[in-house]
A protein has these predicted regions:
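Hydrophobic, aromatic-rich membrane-embedded alpha-helical segments
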Residues: 1, 66-73, 115, 208-228
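Juxtamembrane inter-helical linkers in multi-pass membrane proteins
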Residues: 2-21, 81-103, 179-201
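Loop-to-transmembrane boundary segments
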Residues: 14-34, 96-117, 196-216
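Alpha-helical membrane-inserting segments
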Residues: 31, 35, 39, 43, ...
Length: 230
């Protein structure tokens, strides 16, 4: 892609070891994910014998958020130098130095943006599960259609909030990582610096516009709308 792109007649370039690219793009994320899930499994075995169900859910949810933030933060902190330090523009080389802690912090904050939505969804959907369990205990499993109609507004509202939560999470994470990448990227030994001014709200509005535009055009406008988010 870089070799086929040019600006004012000057071509971009990219040169990187295939083995290193495979390790950074695939090997390291898989290894970190395996270590994370194994550690979470061991912690779950310990907490099961210590506290009750509510304590285990809270503890494991908190540890999962922290672990996912660490895994994604480390992964993205390796991806950025792979792309930035191996790219060129004509005879000039790009250079980037990324702080791993900032990447981890950004990923954790992105995950935390979903917490308010999860709490609201839990409050809305809890009566649904309670009623479902009660019906199962009373042997009224055949009344499923009536049950769905009764709680249809809560179920649809929960799906809608879940969809909004994903968009908020994606927009915040994209803007955070984009800012970390561009604000630390330099060209020609630091002579030229880059800056990102996109906000999370602005990116969220762009994502909504892309989804609406793609839906209206049955996906035909997606390639052009996607370029608007770069």
């Amino acid at each position: 892609q870089a070799n086929m792109t040019s600006l004012n007649g000057i071509r971009f370039g990219f040169n990187c070891s295939m083995l290193r690219a495979w390790w950074v793009m695939l090997g390291l994320p898989v290894l970190l994910a395996l270590v994370f899930w194994f550690a979470l499994y061991l912690i779950a075995q310990v907490t099961t014998s210590i506290g009750g169900l509510f304590f285990n859910l809270v503890a494991l949810s908190l540890l999962s958020a922290i672990g996912l933030g660490v895994v994604h933060g480390i992964t993205y902190s390796k991806w950025m130098p792979l792309l930035g330090n191996n790219a060129t523009f004509g005879i000039h080389k790009f250079s980037i130095q990324v702080n791993v802690k900032e990447c981890i912090k950004g990923c954790m904050l992105a995950i935390l943006t979903m917490v308010p939505f999860i709490i609201v969804i839990g409050i809305m959907i809890a009566p649904v599960f309670q009623q479902l369990m009660m019906m199962t205990m009373l042997g009224r499993s055949d009344a499923g259609s009536e049950f769905v109609l009764q709680y249809y507004p809560q179920i649809m509202a929960s799906y809608f909030l879940y969809f909004v939560a994903i968009l908020v999470f994606a927009s915040y994470l994209y803007v955070t990582l984009r800012s970390l990448f561009l604000n630390n990227l330099t060209l020609a030994n630091g002579t030229i610096r880059f800056h990102s001014s996109v906000t999370a709200i602005g990116m969220l509005l762009r994502m909504l516009a892309v989804l609406m535009g793609s839906s209206i055009t049955c996906g035909l406008a997606y390639p052009w709308l996607k370029m608007w988010m770069v």
